[in-house]
């Protein structure tokens, strides 16, 4: 869940976001070590008067600064490729949900259930119940079953949008006339907030995304309840 003045990642609620967080820490540590090495070399050059006059045939140095960057790039590329594979992997999704972006709300279609479709608008501040998230709460949340693979089909009706949930590690562009795909699984029950992450007009900041994850029996109750509306 987002918090005021937050500078770190939101708590991961999916395996993908956990891997992205680990990859960020891994890459940041490599950058930190390289920065320390460069700083040490600069300080050494500034603080000593010793010079090396025979640099024309420094084959050992050339070998080091060729092989070492290659090793560093490999240590970054391998986990990155693994995460890219996880993003595109589809492992028999439990259901498919289509999200369509409009100015400035979302439409959700549960394609596995007949005539299950609704619009999701942001709740205005003056109508917001006590304790709810300002500018992030909606009148109809997208509800999914817990620990189930969900395939998202994402498109737009008018202009470019982007469907994003930071705690799930998801950010997929919604392009008019095109359908993009994302797959996720949520490992803990809860409510997860996001926003449209593509500038889409005057009310771009008022186009939140809310996903609620429920155990399967509660999800079935939600289906029965929404069918009666």
UniProtKB/Swiss-Prot annotation:
Domain of life: Eukaryota
Cofactor notes: Binds a dinuclear copper A center per subunit.
Amino-acid positions noted as binding Cu cation A2 in the UniProt annotation, renumbered to this chain: 196, 198, 200, 204
InterPro entries documented for this protein: CcO_II (IPR045187), CcO_II-like_C (IPR002429), CcO_II_C (IPR034210), Copper_CuA (IPR001505), Cupredoxin (IPR008972), Cyt_c_oxidase_su2 (IPR014222), Cyt_c_oxidase_su2_TM_dom (IPR011759), Cyt_c_oxidase_su2_TM_sf (IPR036257)
Organism per entry: Pelomedusa subrufa
Protein name, UniProt field: Cytochrome c oxidase subunit 2
Cofactor: Cu cation
Catalyzed reaction equations: 4 Fe(II)-[cytochrome c] + O2 + 8 H(+)(in) = 4 Fe(III)-[cytochrome c] + 2 H2O + 4 H(+)(out)
């Amino acid at each position: 869940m987002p918090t005021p003045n937050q500078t770190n990642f939101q708590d991961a609620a999916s395996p993908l976001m956990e891997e992205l967080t680990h990859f960020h820490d891994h890459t940041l540590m490599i950058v930190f070590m390289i920065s320390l090495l460069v700083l040490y070399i600069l300080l050494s050059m500034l603080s000593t008067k010793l010079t090396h006059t025979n640099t024309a045939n420094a084959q050992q140095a050339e070998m080091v600064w060729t092989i070492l960057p290659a090793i560093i790039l490999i240590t970054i590329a391998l986990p990155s490729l693994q995460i890219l594979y996880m993003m595109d992997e589809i492992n028999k999704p439990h259901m498919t949900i289509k999200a369509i972006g409009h100015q400035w709300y979302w439409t959700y279609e549960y394609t596995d259930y007949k005539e299950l479709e609704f619009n999701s608008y942001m709740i205005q501040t003056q109508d917001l119940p006590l304790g709810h998230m300002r500018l992030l709460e909606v009148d109809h949340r997208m509800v999914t079953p817990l620990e189930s693979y969900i395939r998202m089909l994402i498109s737009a009706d008018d202009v470019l949008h982007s469907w994003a949930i930071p705690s799930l590690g998801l950010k997929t562009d919604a392009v008019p006339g095109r359908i993009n795909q994302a797959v996720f699984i949520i490992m803990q029950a809860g409510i997860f907030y996001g926003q449209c992450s593509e500038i889409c007009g005057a009310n771009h900041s008022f186009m939140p995304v809310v996903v609620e994850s429920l155990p399967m029996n509660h999800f079935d109750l939600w289906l029965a309840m929404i069918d009666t509306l």
